[in-house]
Amino acid sequence: MELLVSWYQSIKLSWQKLTKIIQPLVFAAIVGFACNWLGVPVGWLLGPLLVGIVYACLQEKREPLPSSFIKVSKAIIGLYSASRFSPDTLILATTYAIPVILCILVTGALSIFNGYLLWKWAGVNRLTSFLGSIPGSAATLAMMSEEFGAEPITVTVLQYIRMVIVVITIPTTVTILFPNEALETIMTVQPAVNDSIVSIFFNLPVLAGCCILGIILGDLLKLPTTGFLGAFLLGLLLFWSFPGLFFVPHWLWVIALILVGLSIGWRFNFQAVRKLWKPILLEIILVILLMLSCFVIGYEFHLITQIDLVTAILGFTPGGIEAMIATANQLGGDTGMVLAIQITRQMLILLSLYLLQLTQNISKKKAEI
């Protein structure tokens, strides 16, 4: 009898936890559908993001979303990006490698200058302000901040504010600037029939396998944006080895956007934001100025390389890689090129951080000797 009671209690507890997760997911899907129907740019992402922020404000002691949800959603986006990343895109990216790296260095220098201003004007610790201002893998930067002697909470809040501003404003602005492209491509991003000859019952298990292996690969190699890059690399292997056989269904892409949007909003911390109101206010102004600068850099890149303007602008946007891929998909931009530029920047940033960490460790060892 006691065993039955304990089973009942554990099932009841599991059900309560499940309903706490299902409820916001359902609301996120409804709001995402409404935003998409109303023509809101990247509605399936922005709608759930707003739902997540509302839940975060209303529930002080909320259960965190399962990490598997976030990893799987990023893995799906990684697979989708791989399906749009052709060998031609890789050739194009290598052709314009020098302009790409130069533009990345300019945007990186502007981000570091933002960190300098935060340190000078808002009284934020110098390392904290620099790590909080660098566009890239927000989770990785927040995780590494403590190792560098920075303040992890402040870095997380600054990175979060930048990411939310970018995700909300850039898709809307680009869609307003290029309305004709948006209207033309909305009709094409949701094809009724896929050209693939592989049955969906075989296609989905293969995609699921790529997602799972991609997450494991990402964890083993400690890749940034866990799940995304691992699945992206495996997706490239799959789609390039069997061109035209496998595909990522549109509904799977929508589910991934809902989960990513909800997870971003869910991490909103009102208490931390209230305590850091001065640095955050300055960060908002600096991020807006940085985005305007990135627009100019993207335009110059477009003039030099003749790559379409939508792709150029989204490629050099400071962060929000999933939202930029979704926007490029909606507006008919080259998602592969956007991804190539964004990933190149992430890799350069992470390489710089690892080199900095290595130098710090060597200096400490020398000091001990």
Language-model-detected regions and their locations in the chain:
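Membrane-interface helix termini and inter-helical loops of multi-pass transporters
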Residues: P87-T95, L177-V198, F242-V248, R274, ...
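Cytoplasmic-side transmembrane-helix entry/capping segments in multi-pass membrane proteins
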Residues: P66-I77, A97-L102, G123-I134, T156-I161, ...
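Transmembrane alpha-helix boundary signature
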Residues: K61-E63, S83-Y96, I112-N125, Y299-I304
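Small-residue-rich segments of transmembrane alpha-helices in multi-pass membrane proteins
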Residues: V72-F85, V106-T107, F130-M143, R162-T169, ...
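Alpha-helical membrane segments and immediately flanking helix-loop junctions
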Residues: L118-I161, L309-Q342
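Membrane-embedded alpha-helical segments of transport systems
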Residues: G136-L141, T156-F178, S293, I321-E322, ...
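Membrane-interfacial helix-loop connectors
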Residues: T94, F268, I280-L281, V287-T344
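Structural signature of multi-pass alpha-helical membrane transport proteins
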Residues: E2-S68, I76-T89, L110, N194-A272, ...
